[in-house]
């Protein structure tokens, strides 16, 4: 007697379209030239590309699930989402990042990485806890405790506002008198303060753009009369070949913080490289690197999205009938 075997029907994968789509979310004060460069490059790799400023995005919550809309379009329907949200938009940014994290879209950064990287002290704390070399840092909430911190760093030292970016909110303190006058002003705004040991004799640093396993390095030099090696503040820059030590520190920092795309700023201290800070939404330095960084961002997003989609299409399954 021939045994009866159950019949099976093939169930198609849940994804209906093979079209690749990319959403880029920008801050309220986004740089138009950077957006244009990213969109132009993305249109070569993706079938659909959309840029949405965060202040124009509508967030809806229903039954514990958040949705994002821009001009009536469901933003969580995109295959890939690259949020470039600054600390200025932190509260709204957290809500947007949380919604993205619960969607099926690929995102090269996480809610946790957004929260930590926008808090300079927490960044240092998390990295140092995993053995990544960094600069001696302290967190203070009052002039009194900032004064105690100086006993560890000594003068001069670097003072950073937690919410600062692009070299803003960063001051070199050379004396107790200077510190006290600045702290009095900061205390009026109830700002948290991160202090870091100043590395003397260094007028340059290295920014490592981490894009997956690939790293682009650029050496930044401060302008004359300014100790900050920040191009947005008038400094200069040039591409370099990263050393194995730079590569290891940059990649490890990105991995610990949960970012596939970011920038890790390094400075040399006692013949060793240390992390100064990690940037969640770095500028592409097009003046010095052309479209190199933008190209790598988009290439990585497109390749990762394609691989993820292929896995979904291959996940058809058999169901007994």
Where are these regions (language model features)?
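C-terminal active-site "lid" helix and adjoining low-complexity regulatory extension at the edge
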Residues: 3-6, 255, 268-321
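Active-site nucleotide/adenylate-binding loops and adjacent lid/helix of ATP-dependent enzymes
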Residues: 10-28, 32, 36-40, 75-76, ...
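Short glycine-rich anion-binding loops that position phosphate/pyrophosphate groups of nucleotides
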Residues: 86-88, 163-164, 281
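Protein kinase-like catalytic core scaffold
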Residues: 157, 216, 262, 274-276
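Phosphate-binding site of ATP-dependent enzymes
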Residues: 171-257
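Short glycine-rich, acidic/polar surface loops and turns
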Residues: 250, 261-269
């Amino acid at each position: 007697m021939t045994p009866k075997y159950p019949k099976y029907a093939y169930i198609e994968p849940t994804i209906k379209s093979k079209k690749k789509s990319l959403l880029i979310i920008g801050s309220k004060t986004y740089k138009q030239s950077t957006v244009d460069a990213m969109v132009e490059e993305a249109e070569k790799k993706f079938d659909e590309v959309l840029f949405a400023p965060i202040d124009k995005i509508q967030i809806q919550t229903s039954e514990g699930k958040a949705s994002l809309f821009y001009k009536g379009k469901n933003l969580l329907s995109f295959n890939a989402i690259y949020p470039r949200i600054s600390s200025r938009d932190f509260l709204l940014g957290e809500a947007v990042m949380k919604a993205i994290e619960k969607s099926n879209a690929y995102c090269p950064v996480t809610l946790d990485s957004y929260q930590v990287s926008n808090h300079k002290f927490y960044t240092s704390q998390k990295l140092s806890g995993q053995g990544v070399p960094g600069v001696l840092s302290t967190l203070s909430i009052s002039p009194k405790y900032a004064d105690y911190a100086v006993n560890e760093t000594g003068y001069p030292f670097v003072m950073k506002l937690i919410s600062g970016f692009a070299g803003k909110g960063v001051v070199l303190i050379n004396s107790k008198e200077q510190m006290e006058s600045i702290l009095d002003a900061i205390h009026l705004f109830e700002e948290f303060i991160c202090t870091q040991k100043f590395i003397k004799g260094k007028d340059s640093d290295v920014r490592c753009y981490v894009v997956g396993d690939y790293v682009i390095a650029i050496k930044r030099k401060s302008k004359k009369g300014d100790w900050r090696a920040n191009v947005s503040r008038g400094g200069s820059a040039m591409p370099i070949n990263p050393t194995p030590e730079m590569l290891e520190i940059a990649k490890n920092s990105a991995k610990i913080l949960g970012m596939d795309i970011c920038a890790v700023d390094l400075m040399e201290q006692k013949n060793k490289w240390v992390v100064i800070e990690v940037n969640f939404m770095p500028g592409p330095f097009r003046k010095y690197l052309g479209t190199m960084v933008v190209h790598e961002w988009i290439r990585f997003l497109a390749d990762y999205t394609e691989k993820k989609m292929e896995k979904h299409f291959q996940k058809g399954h058999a169901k007994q009938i």
